[in-house]
Amino acid sequence: MKVNGIEPDINNISSGKYTLRRSYYLTHNGEMNHLQQDFLQYVLCAGQKLVAKKSIAVGTPTTFLSAKASGKLVINGSSSAAPLVKELAAEYMQLNPRAQVTVEVTDSSKGLTAAIRRECDFGISSRELKSYEKELLTANVFARDAIVLIVNKQNPVNNLSTKQIKALYETCNEWKSLN
């Protein structure tokens, strides 16, 4: 189904023309250590190949040579983005067996708060950061997803405005009552 006259295809979602989309963020507080830098570099480079299979990549996959930094990373946050981050972490640990990456599934707010408090190495968010979060954290978009509306083939409606979608969830009980 089109939203505001725009098809929900990869190009429209990536470019922002299709508006029912969101970004996935990896956030951190302050200077990163070598392991954090290495992991983030992987996610934004070679990891984009995996991202493209599961979601919408924000970059083109490029070659990644791990610095083989050792240590533990704790990543905390969004239940929507965590499955993808878990897969990225598993792939990264194959490239860098000296790293141990743990992904804790909570929600975006808890992940961002944990990153602000330095209770984790990265916070994961699937929502836009609030102004104070932007001041306290560095955020890197690593993937995008979109909400796509699917209706019965018999339904003649093929395009809705965001106002109409909101009405469907708040006040309308029938398709014919949409304006």
Over which residues does each language-model region extend?
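Exported/periplasmic ABC-transporter solute-binding proteins
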Residues: 1-179
